[in-house]
């Protein structure tokens, strides 16, 4: 059964593309972007857990 790990990170204005590309280059897939509790954007990512 495939297992996933998740991470959240704030998206800084005017640096969204760089942040998304950085996480994507490490194998993270963007799941969703939402407004955070303090008004900024928060990105949710997932990727398969590596077999140990």
Model-derived regions, located:
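Terminus-proximal functional modules
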Residues: 1-52
């Amino acid at each position: 059964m495939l297992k996933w790990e998740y991470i959240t990170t704030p998206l800084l204005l005017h640096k969204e593309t760089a942040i998304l590309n950085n996480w994507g280059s490490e194998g993270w897939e963007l799941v969703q972007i939402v407004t955070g509790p303090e008004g900024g954007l928060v990105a949710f990512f997932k990727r398969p857990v590596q077999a140990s």
